[in-house]
Amino acid sequence: MSNRKYFGTDGIRGRVGDAPITPDFVLKLGWAAGKVLARHGSRKIIIGKDTRISGYMLESALEAGLAAAGLSALFTGPMPTPAVAYLTRTFRAEAGIVISASHNPFYDNGIKFFSIDGTKLPDAVEEAIEAEMEKEISCVDSAELGKASRIVDAAGRYIEFCKATFPNELSLSELKIVVDCANGATYHIAPNVLRELGANVIAIGCEPNGVNINAEVGATDVRALQARVLAEKADLGIAFDGDGDRVIMVDHEGNKVDGDQIMYIIAREGLRQGQLRGGAVGTLMSNMGLELALKQLGIPFARAKVGDRYVLEKMQEKGWRIGAENSGHVILLDKTTTGDGIVAGLQVLAAMARNHMSLHDLCSGMKMFPQILVNVRYTAGSGDPLEHESVKAVTAEVEAALGNRGRVLLRKSGTEPLIRVMVEGEDEAQVTEFAHRIADAVKAV
């Protein structure tokens, strides 16, 4: 891993007004990116955003920086992250830029780049942009300055793309669906996609005001969706996060259906249709029930580190076409280049329509194991608790007791002095007791 100063695993992110998410930094970032990308030939960059109020300020700053470097900006307006990846490909733009902090609150924002083919920018290009940031900002000759324009049909183009991933011979006319768009970037996309495919749609979380993105709605908080599905006696609910790269579903009984279950349904349907190539990639946090259910179907399963970037890397390494995180990032490389909540949701709906089965019944082949997560704070600088003999001994005892019907995962938080203790097994009471036993051992260090 390179020692980049600004770019993390998912672009540049932070609180608006605090470095680096400030207008002056973002202007210079636009200029530096423009200088680097202009070397590659194309003169246009796609810029999309979610519905945060700060998006207006940041897209203006980016556009000014790009123009100073001689590149033109094409604005999409509020648009899901995967839509920007798609439009970057179809417009043959040199790059796409998304202004979003995904599932974070409105006061955060971030900048993420896509390359010309709709995938993440290569590390070398990000490093070149950072190197350019160290230079004094300059301006091309007036005649060479970049321009700005809007892609007026951006939403329509992406809606048609999404619909094209749903089989022509199927219809959603039998389904009543509640869709929750998190007051985010899918608010004008997802309801229209579902309606045009025939569904009876009830939309919530579709009234963005700049500050209500992800606020008690969307994929990170499905309580409002669960309540509405039950109240409307709907067949199911679908929730997206603020930038539309995650999807979580709710069955007609109000049960949450997470990314693990969604991947199970899509992988099993792919197998039935003879379209599954290779296996499926999850993460260290993927439920053991997923692994066992896929094993019963004869589908290979591999675990990547937590993070959709690492899931994609493992998929590419294996040559597999499907991967997911339990948080709802689902990557289907036969359809898209990045996690796409709408496209993933449509594949589940296709399985429902083709098999005339409810979402609840499609999930029935996979038994979710209870997963207990305990966060333990430790004193930074006092050594690594995970290396302590007492912690290792208790962990070994628990692993021996669980055998091959459970798992223990201990990992450090990347952002604060926390040890995350996760224990998974068939018996919830036993798993809870084991998790707290390990947590107590960590605290005692």
Swiss-Prot record:
Belongs to the phosphohexose mutase family. Mg(2+) binds at residues 102, 241, 243, 245. Its EC number is 5.4.2.10. This is Phosphoglucosamine mutase. Keywords: Isomerase, Magnesium, Metal-binding, Phosphoprotein. The keyword Phosphoprotein applies. Activated by phosphorylation. Can autophosphorylate in vitro using ATP, alpha-D-glucosamine 1,6-bisphosphate or alpha-D-glucose 1,6-bisphosphate. One of its GO terms (cellular component) is cytosol. The keyword Magnesium applies. It comes from Escherichia coli (strain K12). One of its GO terms (biological process) is peptidoglycan biosynthetic process. The active site is at 102 (phosphoserine intermediate). The modification Phosphoserine is found at residue 102. InterPro entries: A-D-PHexomutase_a/b/a-I (IPR005844), A-D-PHexomutase_a/b/a-I/II/III (IPR016055), A-D-PHexomutase_a/b/a-II (IPR005845), A-D-PHexomutase_a/b/a-III (IPR005846), A-D-PHexomutase_C (IPR005843), A-D-PHexomutase_C_sf (IPR036900), A-D-PHexomutase_CS (IPR016066), Alpha-D-phosphohexomutase_SF (IPR005841). It catalyses: alpha-D-glucosamine 1-phosphate = D-glucosamine 6-phosphate. Autophosphorylation is inhibited by inorganic phosphate or EDTA. Pfam families: PGM_PMM_I, PGM_PMM_II, PGM_PMM_III, PGM_PMM_IV. The gene is glmM.
